[in-house]
C-alpha cells in the first residue's frame, strides 16, 4: 500500500497544470516534511570506494541510489525490485534521478536568523520589531542582551543590555525578568508579537500623527504587518531552526582524472555548517562555559549566513584559491544565475552555425544550406524515412548508412528537406527580424548562402559574419515558421512600417545606372514598339542604355471590380527604363519607373507596390529588381580610380583667403581688441566657412558636365563620374566623404569634443603630412572607444525596455474609451518637422473628425486611418485629429486593438495576442547602436550666435497669438507682457504652418489675426536683456531706491550717462536687507495709477542686477522699458544627446537644474528671504497660498504681482517629467516624452513610430498613489497598479460607495520593472535578493500574466499562437470553479474544435498567399 501511495504521490507531482505560483516563508515543519532524512556528518564520499558516506552530504539512504534501480550494497538490482528498501544499506531501489529532487535537512542546535530578512534593505526583522538594524546585529552576534520579558521591573521590552547592565539587573531583580542573547532572543520577540493588536495601534497612530516622515514610517511598518497577517507567514519563521539541504545532484562532486575532485562551492559551505553545528551540539552536551558556547553559536550563525548569501555581511568566505565561494543567493542572481542563464536563455539542439556568403541567385524565401550541415540537422527525419521505406531494417542500420554517406541518403535528404523551413539567426538579435525562416536549398561547400535583400534586417554583411541554423521539429513549429516567420512575410519593418526588404549598394547602383539619361546618346530619338524591341536594339548595339527614346508602354490599372484595365501610350523615356519596365507587375504606374531611381525612390517603389498589389507581387518584384540591379551594375563597370576625385581649381585661393582672415584676427587679438574666446570662435567660423566653399566648388565640378546635344548646343547633364554616381544613387558614400577625398578634410575634434583650430587643408587624394595624420588619429580613436561603450549601453537600454513592456499584449478588440490624444503636425519655427498624415497614419480616430468649418462628419469615430484617408485629410486640409492611443486605453491588463491601431509590420488592424510591448521595446532599442554617446559642449560665442532676436515668417498667412498679454506703445506696435506666448502662422485653409515662442518684452509689428507676407519680420527683441515693461503711462516715482543701500550708481566712461544698478540682497548692507526697491507710476498729482482692468497699483519691484536708466520723476509712456535685467548668457551648456538622453527620458530622471513650475494658479509675491534662497509665494483667488523656497542663483521669469497659471514656468531649465505629470496631466507628459525621444532619433535619421514610445510611457504610468482610500483595501500613500484601482472602483460604483481617489505616478523603466505585480519577472530582472525577500514576506502570488513568467515556468507564452491556449485554459478554469450540483452541459469542457471556433484567427494575407507564392516562384 505504501508503495502505491508513493507512486501516486510521484504521479501527482509531475502535474504542471497550475495557474498561480505563491512564494512564502518555510516553517520548520514544512522543511522537515520536504526532507528525506537528516544530514548528520560533513563527509561527502569515501575516497577509496567512491561510494557516498552514510548520513553524509551525499548519503544514498537520504537522497536516493547512485545507480539506476540498484541499492548501494548491491543486494537488490534490476527493475523487478523497484520500490524495495534494502535492509542492509537502507537505500530505496529506484531511478537515480530522484537525487535531483530529494532534499535533506540539518537540525540546528540553536536558532539562526535568515540573513536575507536581516540584511536585505529595508531589514524585515528590524521593521517588524521596530528596532534599528545595528541593535539587532549586536544581539545576533552576541554583543548584548535583549529584554524579552520585562516582568515587574522597570526595564522595557526590546531594550538592549550590555554584559554589565545585565549582571546588574540580575542582581537587582533576580529572575523577575528575561533577557536573551543571539537568535533565540530575536526568535522569542518575533514569536510574542501580537500582529492584530499591533496593526490596530499603528492605524490609530496613523490617524493622529501629522508629520510626513512619521506617516511614511508607520505606513511601511503597517503594510509589512498586514502582509504577515494575510499571507499566513509567521514572523518567527524568519529565524530558522531547521536548515534544508539541497539535493546532491544539484551540487555535484565530480571525480577528475588524477584522483582530484571538482565540487560545487555549496558542498564546502554545507560542510562548514555541519561541522560547527555538531561541535555546538557536543559543547551543549558537555555543558561548556558560556563564553565558548556563545562563540560557537556566533560561528554557526556566520556559516549559515555564508551558505545563504556569502559576502552580504562581513568578509566573504573564500575557498582554497582565494576567490569567494558561490552561495545559494549567487546561484540565482546575475547574468550567470539560474534565471538568466538557464531559464530565460537555453541552448537548443538541432542547431548549427557557419559563415555566411552571398546567394544572389536565390529567391527571397530561400537560403543555401551546406549538405554536410543538412545531413547532421535532419538526421532523425532521414532515419525515419529510411526505415519507413524499408531501405534500412533498424534505426541502427539507418545510422550506419548515414555515417557512410551512401548515395541513397542524399536523395532521401533532398526529399526530407523539401518545404521544411529552417530558422536563421544572426547575433545580436536586436529585433524580431533577427530570426527569420527560409526554405533550404542543398549546396556544396561549407558556408550558408543568404539572400542579399534580407541583410538589412539581420544587419549582416559578408566579411566573416556567422549565422546559426535551427530546425523547427513539430508540425506546429513548422507551420508557425512558414506562416509568421518566413522572410517573405517580413517585408515591412515593425518599427516604422516602411519596407525593410530594400535593395542597397550594388543593386541600387545598377538600377541608378540603367535609369539615368544622357544628352545625345547613341540612338537618341528612336521610336520602339514595346520594351522588348528596345531591349533587342540595346543588345545588338543599335542604342545606348541611356539614350532618350520614345517607347509604346502598356499600363494596367485596377478598377472598382478589381479587374485590370489596359492603357497604351507613347512615352518619352530611356532604353534602360523601358527594360526595367519589363519586370514591373501589373497595376503599377509607369511614372514610378520613369525617373532616375536612387535608393529612396526604390524604397518608395516597393512600398507603393506593397500597398497597391499586396505581399506576393511585392516579393516577386523585389527579387526581380535585385537580379536586374546586379546584372546592370556589372555592365556599368563603375569603379573608383584616383582620377575620379577631381580637386576644384578654386581650392588654393579659398584657403589663402581664409589664412589671411585668420592672420587678421590674430592681429586684433595681439592688440587686445578681441578676447581669446572670441578669437578662437571666429577662427573656427572662418575655417568652417572655407571648408563649405571648397566643398561647394568641388560638388559643382563633380556633379555636372557639359555635353553637346543633337543641335550642337552645349547642355548640362548629371555627371557620369563613378564616385559621384555612387553617392548620388545612395549606394555608398556621401557628400561628406567625397569632400574629404577631393575637397579638404576640414576641422578635427580633440578627444574631449573641443575643436582644434588648425584644420587639415589637405584631402586624401593629395595625402596628409605627419602632423595632419596625427591630428586625424584623435577622432578615429575616440570613434572606436565610443563604439565599444555604445554597444554595451544600447544593449542594456533594450534589456530594460523589454523588461518593462514584456507583459503588454493585445487582449481585446475594443475597450470602448472615448479618450485619446490630440494630434497636430509637428512644427518647429518655420519648418514642418512631421506632417499630420505621417503622425495619424495607422491610428484609430477617437472622435468624429468634422470637415473644417462645417458640421459635416468627414471621418467617423473608430475608423482606422490608412493611406486613402490620409489623402482625404490632405485634400480637406484637416489640422487636428483626436486619435486613440495606448496611453489612454482602458483595458485592465493589456491593450485593445483599436487603441493600438495598425500592425506596422502587416499593414492592417493589429491581431489579438500580438506582443506589442516587446515589439515596442525592440523598435526603440534596435537603432540604439546608431545613436551617438556624446554630450555636446557648445562654446560661449557659438551659442550666443544661436540666440534668436527676431521672427521672420516663411509662409504667407494669418497670425495667431496664444496666451498673450500685451500693451500698445506710442508707435502703435504691440509689446508683450506675458511669458510663454506662442505665435503661429495659419494658411487660408486654417492649417498651422509655423510655430514660434515669443519672449516677454518682444515688440510685434502685427497683431492677432493680421495678414503677413512671405519673409516679413513680425517680432523683435533683445536676446541679452529682459526689459521691465510699463503697462500704464505716467511719472516714475522711486520707492526704496537708496544710493549705497539698495542700488549703486554707474557712469559710462564713453557716453557719460549714469545708470542705477540694483544690488542683490546678499551684497547689501544690513540696513538695506529689508528694503524692496521698486518703481511706482503716479499721475501728475502723485496718486497711484492702477493697471487697466484690475485694482492693482502699477508698481514694479526690481530684482537684483536690474539696471534703471531713467531718473526719478521722468515721464514714461505705455509699453516702454522701465528697467533692463541682463540675461547672463550661460557659459557652456552641455546638451546631452544620443543614447544617454534617451535613457534619461525613459528612466524619468530629474535634470540637474530643472525648470521650476508654478504649482497653483495665482498672483506671485516674494516672502522673507533666507541666506541662500528666496521665498516665492503664489496666492490664488481663493484657497491657501503656496510657498516655495528657490535658490538665489536661479533666474526667475516672473515679477512680483504677476498672475501665473498652474504649470507655467517660473524659472527656466529642463522640465522634469514628474512635474509635467503632476501639473499638466498624462497627455502632456506623454507628449513631452514622445517628442523628446523622437528628437534624438530624428537627428540620426532613424524613423520610429510614436506608438512604440507611447507603449513604454503607458508602462511607466502603470502605478498610482492613493490619495483618499475611504474604506477600501488600499492604504493612503500606497503605490498600486492603476488597473487594480480601476477594478476596485468599478465594484464600488456598483455598490454606490465613493470612489477611491488616486494620482498617477511616473516611474522610470528600471523602477517600473521592479515594481511589476509579478515577482518572478522582477526577480529575473535585477536585485533578485531584494525582490524575492519582499515577495516571500508578503506571501505574494504570481498570476503568470506576462511573457517572462511563462517562459520561466516553461509554458507557452500568452501571446501570439499561445494566446488562444491561455484563453482556453482560463475558460476551463472558470468552468471547473463552478459548483458541482448543476448539470454539466456537454460542452463545459471545450473541445479543440470549440476553442478553434472561438479564436478564429484572421489568417493573414501572408498565410493565404504562401502556397500560391511558393508555387509561383518555382515555375518562373
Swiss-Prot record:
One of the GO BP terms on file: DNA-templated transcription
Example GO molecular function: DNA binding
Cofactor info, note text: Binds 1 Mg(2+) ion per subunit.
Sequence positions that bind Mg(2+): 461, 463, 465
Residues binding Zn(2+) 2, per UniProt: 815, 889, 896, 899
Sites where the protein binds Zn(2+) 1: 71, 73, 86, 89
Name of the top EC class for this enzyme: transferase
Reaction equation(s) it catalyzes: RNA(n) + a ribonucleoside 5'-triphosphate = RNA(n+1) + diphosphate
Family recorded in the similarity comment: Belongs to the RNA polymerase beta' chain family.
Function: DNA-dependent RNA polymerase catalyzes the transcription of DNA into RNA using the four ribonucleoside triphosphates as substrates.
HAMAP family: RNApol_bact_RpoC
UniProt protein name: DNA-directed RNA polymerase subunit beta'
Organism name: Haemophilus ducreyi (strain 35000HP / ATCC 700724)
Lineage: Bacteria, Pseudomonadati, Pseudomonadota, Gammaproteobacteria, Pasteurellales
Amino acid at each position: 500500500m505504501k508503495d502505491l501511495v508513493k507512486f501516486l504521490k510521484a504521479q501527482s507531482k509531475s502535474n504542471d497544470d497550475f495557474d498561480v505560483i505563491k512564494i512564502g516563508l518555510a516553517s520548520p515543519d514544512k522543511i522537515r516534511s520536504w526532507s528525506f532524512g537528516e544530514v548528520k556528518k560533513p563527509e561527502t564520499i569515501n575516497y577509496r570506494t567512491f561510494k557516498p558516506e552514510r548520513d553524509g552530504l551525499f548519503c544514498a539512504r537520504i537522497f536516493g541510489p547512485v545507480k539506476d534501480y540498484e541499492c548501494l550494497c548491491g543486494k537488490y538490482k534490476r527493475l523487478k525490485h523497484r520500490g524495495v528498501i534494502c535492509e542492509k544499506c537502507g537505500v530505496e531501489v529506484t531511478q537515480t534521478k530522484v537525487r535531483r529532487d530529494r532534499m535533506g535537512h540539518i537540525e540546528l542546535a540553536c536558532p539562526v536568523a535568515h540573513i536575507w530578512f536581516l540584511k536585505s534593505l529595508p531589514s524585515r526583522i528590524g521593521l517588524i520589531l521596530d528596532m534599528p538594524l545595528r541593535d539587532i546585529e549586536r544581539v545576533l552576534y552576541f554583543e548584548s542582551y535583549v529584554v524579552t520579558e520585562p516582568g515587574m521591573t522597570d526595564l522595557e521590552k526590546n531594550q538592549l543590555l550590555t554584559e554589565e547592565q545585565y549582571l546588574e539587573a540580575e542582581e537587582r531583580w533576580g529572575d523577575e525578568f528575561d533577557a536573551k542573547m543571539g537568535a533565540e532572543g530575536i526568535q522569542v520577540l518575533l514569536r510574542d508579537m501580537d500582529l492584530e493588536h499591533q496593526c490596530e495601534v499603528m492605524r490609530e497612530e496613523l490617524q493622529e500623527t501629522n508629520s510626513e516622515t512619521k506617516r511614511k514610517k508607520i505606513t511601511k511598518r503597517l503594510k509589512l504587518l498586514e502582509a504577515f497577517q494575510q499571507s499566513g507567514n509567521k514572523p518567527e519563521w524568519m529565524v530558522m531552526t531547521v536548515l534544508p539541504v539541497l539535493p546532491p545532484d544539484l551540487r555535484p562532486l565530480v571525480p577528475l582524472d588524477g584522483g582530484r575532485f571538482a565540487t560545487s562551492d555549496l558542498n564546502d559551505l554545507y560542510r562548514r555548517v555541519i561541522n560547527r553545528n555538531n561541535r555546538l551540539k557536543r559543547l551543549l552536551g558537555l555543558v561548556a562555559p558560556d563564553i565558548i558556547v556563545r562563540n560557537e553559536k556566533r560561528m554557526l550563525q556566520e556559516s549559515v549566513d555564508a551558505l545563504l548569501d556569502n559576502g552580504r555581511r562581513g568578509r566573504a568566505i573564500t575557498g582554497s584559491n582565494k576567490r569567494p565561494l558561490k552561495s545559494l543567493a549567487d546561484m540565482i542572481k546575475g547574468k550567470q544565475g539560474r534565471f538568466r542563464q538557464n531559464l530565460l536563455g537555453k541552448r537548443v539542439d538541432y542547431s548549427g552555425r557557419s559563415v555566411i556568403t552571398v546567394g544572389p541567385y536565390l529567391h527571397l524565401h530561400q537560403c543555401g544550406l551546406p549538405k554536410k550541415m543538412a545531413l547532421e540537422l535532419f538526421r532523425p527525419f532521414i532515419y525515419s524515412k529510411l526505415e519507413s521505406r524499408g531501405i534500412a531494417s533498424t534505426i541502427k542500420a539507418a545510422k550506419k548508412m548515414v555515417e557512410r554517406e551512401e548515395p541513397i541518403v542524399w536523395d532521401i535528404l533532398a526529399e526530407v528537406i523539401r518545404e521544411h523551413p529552417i530558422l536563421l539567426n544572426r547575433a545580436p538579435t536586436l529585433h524580431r527580424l533577427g530570426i527569420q525562416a527560409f526554405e533550404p536549398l542543398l549546396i556544396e561547400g561549407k558556408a550558408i548562402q543568404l539572400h542579399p535583400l534580407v541583410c538589412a534586417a539581420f544587419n549582416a554583411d559578408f566579411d566573416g559574419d556567422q549565422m546559426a541554423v535551427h530546425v523547427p521539429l513539430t508540425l506546429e513549429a513548422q507551420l508557425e515558421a512558414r506562416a509568421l516567420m518566413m522572410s517573405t512575410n517580413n517585408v515591412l519593418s515593425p518599427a516604422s512600417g516602411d519596407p525593410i526588404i530594400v535593395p542597397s549598394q550594388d543593386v541600387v547602383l545598377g538600377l541608378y545606372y540603367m535609369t539615368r539619361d544622357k544628352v545625345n546618346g547613341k540612338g537618341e530619338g528612336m521610336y520602339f514598339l514595346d520594351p522588348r524591341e528596345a531591349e533587342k536594339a540595346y543588345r545588338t548595339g543599335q542604342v545606348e542604355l541611356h539614350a532618350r527614346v520614345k517607347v509604346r508602354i502598356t499600363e494596367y490599372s485596377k478598377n472598382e471590380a478589381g479587374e485590370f484595365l489596359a492603357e497604351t501610350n507613347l512615352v518619352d523615356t530611356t532604353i534602360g527604363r523601358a527594360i526595367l519596365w519589363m519586370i514591373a507587375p501589373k497595376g503599377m504606374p509607369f511614372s514610378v519607373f520613369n525617373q532616375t531611381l536612387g535608393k529612396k525612390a526604390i524604397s518608395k517603389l516597393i512600398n507603393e507596390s506593397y500597398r497597391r498589389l499586396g505581399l506576393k507581387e511585392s516579393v516577386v518584384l523585389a527579387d526581380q529588381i535585385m537580379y536586374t540591379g546586379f546584372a546592370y551594375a556589372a555592365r556599368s563597370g563603375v569603379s573608383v580610380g584616383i582620377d575620379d576625385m577631381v580637386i576644384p581649381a578654386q581650392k588654393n585661393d579659398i584657403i589663402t583667403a581664409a589664412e589671411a582672415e585668420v592672420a587678421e584676427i590674430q592681429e586684433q587679438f595681439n592688440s587686445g581688441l578681441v578676447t581669446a574666446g572670441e578669437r578662437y570662435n571666429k577662427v573656427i567660423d572662418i575655417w568652417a566657412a572655407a571648408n563649405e566653399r571648397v566643398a561647394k566648388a568641388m560638388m559643382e565640378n563633380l556633379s555636372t558636365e557639359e555635353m553637346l546635344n543633337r543641335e550642337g548646343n552645349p547642355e548640362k547633364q548629371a555627371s557620369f563620374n563613378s564616385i559621384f554616381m555612387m553617392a548620388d544613387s545612395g549606394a555608398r558614400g556621401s557628400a561628406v566623404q567625397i569632400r574629404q577625398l577631393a575637397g579638404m578634410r576640414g576641422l578635427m575634434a580633440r578627444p574631449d569634443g573641443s575643436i582644434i583650430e588648425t584644420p587639415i587643408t589637405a584631402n586624401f587624394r593629395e595625402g596628409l603630412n605627419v602632423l595632419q595624420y596625427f591630428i586625424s588619429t584623435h577622432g578615429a580613436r575616440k570613434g572606436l572607444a565610443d563604439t565599444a561603450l555604445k554597444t554595451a549601453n544600447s544593449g542594456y537600454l533594450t534589456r530594460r525596455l523589454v523588461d518593462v513592456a514584456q507583459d503588454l499584449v493585445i487582449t481585446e478588440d475594443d475597450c470602448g474609451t472615448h479618450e485619446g490624444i490630440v494630434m497636430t503636425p509637428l512644427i518647429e519655427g518655420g519648418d514642418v518637422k512631421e506632417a499630420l498624415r505621417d503622425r495619424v497614419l495607422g491610428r484609430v480616430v477617437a472622435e468624429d473628425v468634422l470637415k473644417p468649418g462645417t458640421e459635416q462628419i468627414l471621418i467617423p469615430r473608430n475608423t482606422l486611418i490608412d493611406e486613402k484617408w490620409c489623402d482625404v485629410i490632405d485634400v480637406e486640409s484637416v489640422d487636428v485629429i483626436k486619435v486613440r492611443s495606448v496611453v489612454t486605453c482602458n483595458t485592465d491588463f493589456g491593450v485593445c486593438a483599436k487603441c493600438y491601431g495598425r500592425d506596422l509590420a502587416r499593414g492592417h488592424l493589429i491581431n489579438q495576442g500580438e506582443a506589442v510591448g516587446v515589439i515596442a521595446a525592440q523598435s526603440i532599442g534596435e537603432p540604439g547602436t546608431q545613436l551617438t554617446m556624446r554630450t555636446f559642449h557648445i562654446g560661449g560665442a557659438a551659442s550666443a550666435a544661436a540666440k534668436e532676436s527676431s521672427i521672420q515668417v516663411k509662409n504667407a498667412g494669418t497670425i495667431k497669438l496664444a496666451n498673450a498679454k500685451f500693451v500698445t506703445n506710442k508707435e502703435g506696435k504691440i509689446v508683450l507682457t506675458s511669458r510663454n506666448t506662442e505665435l503661429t502662422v495659419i494658411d487660408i485653409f486654417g492649417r498651422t504652418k509655423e510655430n514660434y515662442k515669443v519672449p516677454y518684452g518682444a515688440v510685434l509689428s502685427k497683431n492677432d489675426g493680421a495678414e503677413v507676407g512671405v519673409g516679413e519680420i513680425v517680432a523683435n527683441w533683445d536676446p541679452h536683456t529682459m526689459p521691465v515693461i510699463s503697462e500704464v503711462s505716467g511719472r516714475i516715482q522711486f520707492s526704496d531706491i537708496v544710493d549705497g543701500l539698495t542700488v549703486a550708481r554707474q557712469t559710462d566712461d564713453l557716453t557719460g550717462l549714469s545708470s542705477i544698478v540694483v544690488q542683490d540682497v546678499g551684497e547689501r548692507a544690513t540696513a538695506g536687507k529689508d528694503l524692496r526697491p521698486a518703481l511706482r507710476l503716479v499721475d501728475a498729482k502723485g496718486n497711484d495709477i492702477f493697471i487697466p482692468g484690475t485694482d492693482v497699483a502699477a508698481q514694479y519691484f526690481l530684482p537684483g542686477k536690474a539696471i534703471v536708466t531713467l531718473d526719478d520723476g521722468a515721464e514714461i509712456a505705455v509699453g516702454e522699458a522701465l528697467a533692463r535685467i541682463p540675461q547672463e548668457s550661460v557659459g557652456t551648456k552641455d546638451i546631452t544627446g544620443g543614447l544617454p538622453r534617451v535613457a534619461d527620458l525613459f528612466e524619468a530622471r530629474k535634470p540637474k537644474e530643472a525648470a521650476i513650475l508654478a504649482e497653483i494658479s495665482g498672483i506671485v509675491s516674494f516672502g522673507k528671504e533666507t541666506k541662500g534662497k528666496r521665498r516665492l509665494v503664489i496666492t490664488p483667488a481663493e484657497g491657501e497660498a503656496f510657498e516655495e523656497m528657490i535658490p538665489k542663483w536661479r533666474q526667475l521669469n516672473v515679477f512680483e504681482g504677476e498672475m501665473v497659471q498652474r504649470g507655467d514656468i517660473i524659472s527656466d531649465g529642463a522640465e522634469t517629467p514628474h512635474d509635467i505629470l503632476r501639473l499638466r496631466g498624462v497627455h502632456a507628459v506623454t507628449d513631452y516624452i514622445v517628442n523628446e525621444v523622437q528628437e534624438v532619433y530624428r537627428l540620426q535619421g532613424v524613423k520610429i513610430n510614436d506608438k512604440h514610445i507611447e507603449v513604454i510611457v503607458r508602462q511607466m504610468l502603470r502605478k498610482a498613489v492613493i490619495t483618499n482610500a475611504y474604506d477600501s483595501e488600499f492604504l493612503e500613500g500606497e503605490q498600486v497598479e492603476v488597473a487594480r484601482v480601476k477594478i476596485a472602483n468599478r465594484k464600488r460604483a456598483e455598490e454606490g460607495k465613493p470612489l477611491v481617489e488616486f494620482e498617477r505616478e511616473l516611474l522610470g523603466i528600471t523602477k517600473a520593472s521592479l515594481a511589476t505585480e509579478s515577482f518572478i519577472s522582477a526577480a529575473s530582472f535585477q536585485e533578485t535578493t531584494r525582490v524575492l525577500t519582499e515577495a516571500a514576506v508578503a506571501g505574494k502570488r504570481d498570476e503568470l500574466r506576462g511573457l517572462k513568467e511563462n517562459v520561466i515556468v516553461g509554458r507557452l507564452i500568452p501571446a501570439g499562437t499561445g494566446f488562444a491556449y491561455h484563453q482556453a485554459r482560463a475558460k476551463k478554469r472558470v468552468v471547473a470553479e463552478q459548483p458541482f450540483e448543476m448539470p454539466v452541459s456537454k460542452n463545459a469542457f471545450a473541445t479543440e474544435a470549440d476553442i478553434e471556433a472561438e479564436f478564429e484567427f484572421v489568417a493573414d494575407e501572408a498565410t493565404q498567399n504562401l502556397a500560391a507564392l511558393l508555387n509561383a516562384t518555382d515555375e518562373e
